[in-house]
Amino acid sequence: MTIAESTAAEAIFLECERARAEGDLIQRVSASDKEYHFQNWVEARIQACTLDYDEPGRNTYPDFRLVNQPEGYEVKGLEFPGREADYDSNSQVPTGNHNGREVFYVFGRYPKAERGVNEYPVVDLVVCHGSFLNADTEYVHKNKSFRGFGSYGDILVRDRKMYVVPTPFALVAGTAGLATLILPADYKVRSDQLVEVGQLERVEVDDVLVSYEFNLQTNEMLTHKKPNPNAGIVHHFRAYRSRGVGDSKLVTLA
């Protein structure tokens, strides 16, 4: 099964839009909960679709891995207004395929937390295939370390990379206040509840970064690139909305 043949993304997206439109609110568990409240909201949507999945853990990727379909869903909640142009991806580069699973991302924006307010709405959301964020599926992140730093040579230096990735809200225009589904163009949607609202293209760069150096004396970083064997390749995507809910507002690259 490939993304071009079948996916649960349609059902999950439509359930997310139904819940958002009908006012199913995000429940904040505690004042210190800054990560899992939107994930819990998405989990309830997956449950409503009667899809079986492995329980998420703090270090699992993607967050929700379906049992009966080779798919996974990574959830990213964003306070609005706030930081919404990009997000921190700790030790994991976004991808459209991970360990044989098609990967989809669920981005949701919600109001900033206020004292005494423990529930709030989903302002807007985007469900997109991971290849819309990054087309490469071969890179494998690894944490590395070495010992020998410091006056006595016994300090360990860990290289634990943090990737800062643009969100769909920054990459495309026409998503504010609505729910949008972005899929590879070769996928044929099956639900008559979905209406196409845009065609999007992302073009691979001429040169790709392959390594970097960090000078511990000057605190300067030097990057190294090489020609991209896929330079100029255009990746085509289509954007969809629920019929009758913002389907006259087009989605375009920003």
Regions inferred by a protein language model and the residue ranges of each:
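Nucleic-acid endonuclease domains
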Residues: 1-60, 67, 77-254
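Conserved active-site neighborhood of enzyme catalytic/cofactor-binding cores
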Residues: 74
